């Protein structure tokens, strides 16, 4: 089978290509230029070239920087301006990696596209679903919630049945040169964020604009440094007059540049809503597992789909719901779909 392999210049994607080559597939290596950091691209393209030379496969470099900026990067900035907490990876995957890059792969005559994601694909009743990775500590299925089933059918995740701790030894044994590759120390999972998301926002918008902090009764009780510097649940970085106990951000009013704070129990909710992006129209209401943040434990909840809104009800208190984050619905370890929390 002819497969396009997305190479990032790192160990995981290189080993993904190696394992597919060992299985006898015809491969085309593909590097995507997404964020606007040529210095990083130069280094990672060299790394990807080394992997391709070792495997004896061609490498294509696709420049999607303009598309990435308009559909992912600018949306990231806009969401923070609106007081939301966005997750750009959930946009990038369907639009860039498994959108534009998949389209290009199909034009090259490839049947499928592979990446180093920690996830799996499972076919149920002739429909392809994303399944959680074997290694639950590294599972990335959450970021893939917006993919259509027709797209999922064309995906290959060679690392899905492996444990992260085992991959580096396997990769170095198979491709010894990987141990000598230079990489950048990534500060977090967002590829275009150098130090912190605030530093990225500062390049485009005014983030250091002092405003007031109010309690749940609407009384002014302190000040903050600028609403974009805070996310739901944060308890530091703002001043409260005479505070004797911790206060947490429970709301953000972007238009007024105000924070609303309360006690930890004020972060609790028993329901939430999300604008549907990928749950199928015939979704049956019932008890499912949901995740409202990437690094959160799946929580059992009652989920229903009404028109374009996913409605979720919890038996017990659920904490730290932030507008703009992805709500993802699972049946056991099978991802059914999700939406954006409103």
Swiss-Prot record:
One GO cellular component term: cytoplasm
Database matches in InterPro entries = MnmA-like, MnmA-like_C, MnmA-like_central, MnmA-like_central_sf, Rossmann-like_a/b/a_fold
State the active site.
92 (nucleophile), 191 (cysteine persulfide intermediate)
Reactions this protein catalyses: S-sulfanyl-L-cysteinyl-[protein] + uridine(34) in tRNA + AH2 + ATP = 2-thiouridine(34) in tRNA + L-cysteinyl-[protein] + A + AMP + diphosphate + H(+)
Could you tell me the Gene Ontology terms of the biological process aspect for this record? tRNA wobble position uridine thiolation
SUPFAM superfamilies registered for this protein in UniProt: Adenine nucleotide alpha hydrolases-like (SSF52402)
Q: What does this protein do?
A: Catalyzes the 2-thiolation of uridine at the wobble position (U34) of tRNA, leading to the formation of s(2)U34.
Put simply, this protein is called: tRNA-specific 2-thiouridylase MnmA
Q: Per UniProt, what is the name of the gene that codes for the protein in this document?
A: mnmA
């Amino acid at each position: 089978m002819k497969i396009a392999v997305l190479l990032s210049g790192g160990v995981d994607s290189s080993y993904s290509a190696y394992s597919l080559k060992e299985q006898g597939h015809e491969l085309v290596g593909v590097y995507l230029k997404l964020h606007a950091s040529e210095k990083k691209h130069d280094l990672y393209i060299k790394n990807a070239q080394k992997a391709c030379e070792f495997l004896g496969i061609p490498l294509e470099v696709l420049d999607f920087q303009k598309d990435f900026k308009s559909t992912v990067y600018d949306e990231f900035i806009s969401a923070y301006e609106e007081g939301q907490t966005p997750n750009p990876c959930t946009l990038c995957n369907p639009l860039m990696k498994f959108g534009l890059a998949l389209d290009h792969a199909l034009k090259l005559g490839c049947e499928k596209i592979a990446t180093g994601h920690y996830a799996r694909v499972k076919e149920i009743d002739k429909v392809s679903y994303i399944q959680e990775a074997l290694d639950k500590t590294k599972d990335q299925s959450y970021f893939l919630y917006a993919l259509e089933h027709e797209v999922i059918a064309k995906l290959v995740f060679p690392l899905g049945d492996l444990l992260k701790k085992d991959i580096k030894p396997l990769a170095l044994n198979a491709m010894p040169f990987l141990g000598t590759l230079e990489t950048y120390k990534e500060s977090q999972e967002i590829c275009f964020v150098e130090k912190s998301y605030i530093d990225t926002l500062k390049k485009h918008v005014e983030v250091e604009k002092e405003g007031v902090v109010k309690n749940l009764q609407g009384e002014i009780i302190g000040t903050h440094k600028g609403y974009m510097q805070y996310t739901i649940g944060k308890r530091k970085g703002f001043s409260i007059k005479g505070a004797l106990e911790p206060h947490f951000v429970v709301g953000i009013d972007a238009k007024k540049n105000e924070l609303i704070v309360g006690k930890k129990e004020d972060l609790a909710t028993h329901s939430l809503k999300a604008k549907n992006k990928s749950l199928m129209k015939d979704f049956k209401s019932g008890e499912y597992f949901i995740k409202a943040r990437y690094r959160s434990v799946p929580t059992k909840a009652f989920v229903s789909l009404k028109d374009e809104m996913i409605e979720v009800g919890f038996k017990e208190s659920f904490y730290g719901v932030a507008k703009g984050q992805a709500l993802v619905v699972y049946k056991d370890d099978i991802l059914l779909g999700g939406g954006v929390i409103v």
